Amino acid sequence: MKWGINMLNREIINALLDIKAVELRVDKENWFTWASGIKSPIYCDNRLTMSYPKIRKQIAEGFVKKINELYPNVDYIVGTATAGIPHAAWISDIMDLPMLYVRGSAKDHGKTNQIEGKFEKGKKVVVIEDLISTGKSSVLAAQALQEEGLEVLGVIAIFSYNLNKAKEKFDEAKIPFSTLTNYDVLLELAKETGLIGDKENQILIDWRNNL
């Protein structure tokens, strides 16, 4: 996976920093704890973007551009529950495509569906995520779609921490993935703007490289 830097990468990181969707804590005693149990100096809450029309539109247009470049033959846009659902809705509206969403697991009531929406087996889908950390939940969502007979062209997220274990999970599952922006761009801009210095930058690089 080549983590490219372009203007869209930078614009989205700037927007996430402006609305405090990304928070950095270089003091190890104050690090965040992810749901996976990983201790982290960074927390990215892309759900906040829903509350900012200009930013969510910019993100949706970024998704559409990437989908058109990578997967122009897509049939359905699929959001992951819950944070990927609104972005999938905005994307599918712009592209005039059907939308589905996929849960982390099947319901234990009603029709016990894991995938919601009407679909035909054999159709091509792109999965929309707000965030890729370890890649586990994204891969499980994509595999659930494959098990129902859908062809997963790839997973696209707003942001990735660029963790090696995420790349390994996607490679093992043979599922392509890409993002609108990523951890490397975040560190570059944080340093440029004085949000972090050389010492803090190295702490953040070492944390990522050691996972």
From Swiss-Prot:
Keyword flag Magnesium: yes
Species this protein is from: Fusobacterium nucleatum subsp. nucleatum (strain ATCC 25586 / DSM 15643 / BCRC 10681 / CIP 101130 / JCM 8532 / KCTC 2640 / LMG 13131 / VPI 4355)
Quaternary structure annotation from Swiss-Prot or TrEMBL: Homodimer.
Gene symbol of the encoding locus: pyrE
GO BP term, pick one: pyrimidine nucleobase biosynthetic process
Name of the protein: Orotate phosphoribosyltransferase
Binding-site residues for 5-phospho-alpha-D-ribose 1-diphosphate, renumbered to this chain: 103, 107, 109, 129-137
Reactions catalysed according to its record: orotidine 5'-phosphate + diphosphate = orotate + 5-phospho-alpha-D-ribose 1-diphosphate
NCBIfam families: pyrE
Pathway of action: Pyrimidine metabolism; UMP biosynthesis via de novo pathway; UMP from orotate: step 1/2
One Pfam match: Pribosyltran
GO MF annotations in UniProt: magnesium ion binding; orotate phosphoribosyltransferase activity
EC top class, as a word: transferase
UniProt similarity note: Belongs to the purine/pyrimidine phosphoribosyltransferase family. PyrE subfamily.
Cofactor list: Mg(2+)
Function: Catalyzes the transfer of a ribosyl phosphate group from 5-phosphoribose 1-diphosphate to orotate, leading to the formation of orotidine monophosphate (OMP).
Chain positions recorded as orotate binding sites: 133
UniProt keyword list: Glycosyltransferase, Magnesium, Pyrimidine biosynthesis, Transferase
EC number per UniProt: 2.4.2.10
